[in-house]
Structure formats: C-alpha cells, structure tokens
C-alpha cells in the first residue's frame, strides 16, 4: 500500500505496513489516524461515525495514489484537511436530514440541551464549536488542533491567507463570547 511521505520525505508515496498486522494495508500510520479522528471529533462528528470518517480519509488517499497523482506534500496535513471537509459534509447532511424531519413532523419543538451547566471546559468548547459556522469551525480546528499554519490552511482550502485569518479571528471571538456567556471561563 502506498503512503505519502512525512514532512521530511514529502513528495513520494512509500510502502507502509499496518501497525497491527504488519501486512502493509493501511495508508495512514497510527499518529495520522489519531489526528484524523480528533479533527473529525472536534468538527462535531459523533463518536459512532468516527470509524467511517477515518475510512473515508483512507479511501481518498488510496484513490489519489491509484489515480497516479503526486503524493500530498504533507500527508498528515492533507488528511487533517480531508477530515475537516468530511466533518463539514457531515454537518450539511445532518442539516438536510433535520430539515426533512421538520417537514415531515409539521409542528415539532426544537430539541434544546437540558440547560444544566457543566463544569467540563472541553464539553463547553465542543458545544461552542458546534455553534460556529462550518467555515469558521474548520479553520479553528485546523489551526489549533491540527496545528497547521495559516498559509498551509489557506493552501489546502484554496482560499487567501487573509480569509483564513479573518475566519479564525471571528471564530475565536465568537467562541470566547460563547464561553463567557455560558460562564464557563
């Protein structure tokens, strides 16, 4: 199986081995898989859907290799961006399902959280992330969790660096306001 090179060897696919069986059938190493799972989770994908998301990233990497295209310059960053895009897609699909459900159930009360305050900052941050627009959530996760630089995020998303900075600033401000509003921080 082909695996994109690391930052040190960034331009070639290399043969990799599966970390559990040694059979070479996994295009993502353990660290890359953990990063993909984390980006998906921080992007709001539920735990039950994380294995499917990781498989989608693997599939896209294998499809890229099979098509003969050049390996991503940084497979780990590429996989994080793909995972982030999958999280955005998951939210869009969820929104479509919810809209369909609302049409079918003419008068349905919106589901709200129980309102109980939580002392877990991580839960509050996750809820705050869910409340952000997809584009803002995406750059926030890529910058602060996937630890990508602004220029790398801009390159992977195909937007100007200024757009990434603007989205990042707006997202951080909105998340900070949400956490203060909920009296978490």
Residue ranges and their predicted role:
Residues 139-143:
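A short pre-motif secondary-structure segment
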Residues 84, 88, 157-181:
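DNA-recognition helix of helix-turn-helix
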Residues 3-41, 47-54, 62-65:
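A short, charge-rich alpha-helical start-of-domain segment used by transcription regulators
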């Amino acid at each position: 199986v082909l695996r994109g090179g690391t930052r040190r060897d960034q331009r070639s696919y290399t043969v990799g081995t599966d970390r559990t069986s040694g059979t070479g059938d996994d295009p993502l190493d353990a660290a890359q898989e953990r990063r993909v799972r984390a980006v998906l989770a921080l992007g709001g994908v539920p735990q039950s859907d994380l294995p499917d998301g990781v498989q989608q990233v693997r599939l896209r990497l294998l499809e890229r290799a099979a098509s003969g295209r050049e390996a991503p310059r940084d497979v780990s960053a590429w996989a994080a961006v793909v995972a982030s895009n999958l999280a955005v897609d998951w939210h869009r699909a969820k929104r479509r399902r919810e809209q369909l459900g609302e049409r079918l159930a003419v008068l349905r009360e919106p589901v709200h959280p129980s309102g109980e305050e939580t002392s877990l900052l991580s839960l509050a941050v996750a809820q705050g992330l869910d409340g952000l627009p997809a584009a803002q959530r995406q750059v926030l996760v890529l910058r602060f969790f996937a630890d990508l630089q602004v220029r790398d995020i801009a390159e992977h998303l195909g937007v100007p660096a200024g757009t990434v900075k603007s989205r990042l600033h707006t997202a951080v401000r909105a998340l900070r306001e949400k956490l203060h509003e909920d009296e978490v921080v």
